[in-house]
């Protein structure tokens, strides 16, 4: 699925605060919990996971 103009704000949120971008994309799901854990363990893994979720959806 190509990235649209509506994805740009989510992508920016995902780079600044990864769980926020994931929450906007999928809501309160296991992906959000995984992203919160990855962000706490290391910022870069959280960003990578958030971008993956945005591109996957």
Swiss-Prot record:
Stretches that traverse the bilayer: 8-28, 34-54
Pfam families hit by this protein: Pmp3 (PF01679)
Subcellular location: Membrane
Keyword terms, alphabetized: Membrane, Transmembrane, Transmembrane helix
InterPro entries tied to this protein: PMP3
Membrane topology of this protein: Multi-pass membrane protein
Keyword match Transmembrane: yes
Signal peptide range: none
GO cellular component assignments: membrane
The family this protein is said to belong to: Belongs to the UPF0057 (PMP3) family.
UniProt-recorded name of the protein: Protein Ric1
Organism: Phytophthora infestans (Potato late blight agent)
Gene of this entry: RIC1
